[in-house]
Design a protein with these regions (language model features):
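Short alpha-helical elements
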Residues: 1-86
Length: 86
């Protein structure tokens, strides 16, 4: 599979968007949030089941629950719309 890590430039743009997004919590550990976004990217590229998420991205169930929260809050939809015009 191709590398799903974000470049520093990509992460900076995503992080700046998320800081303005009231329903997306980055937290004090920005690297953990970056790993979360990379985990979602890995899932979308691999088509795998959540339980097969590599451990380097964190606990699959925690990543899944956060993904679902962001889905329900519309974070992903707004992010995609934002970057579609970028």
């Amino acid at each position: 599979m191709t590398d799903v890590r974000l470049t520093d430039d990509q992460w900076t743009k995503i992080r700046d968007f998320l800081r303005q997004e009231p329903n997306a919590y980055i937290g004090k550990d920005e690297q953990a949030c970056r790993r979360f976004v990379e985990a979602v990217k890995w899932m979308s590229r691999s088509g795998s089941q959540w339980r097969l998420l590599p451990a380097e991205y964190g606990n699959w169930n925690s990543v899944y629950k956060r993904f679902v929260r962001w889905c329900k809050a519309g974070v992903w939809e707004r992010m995609l719309a934002h970057f579609a015009t970028d």
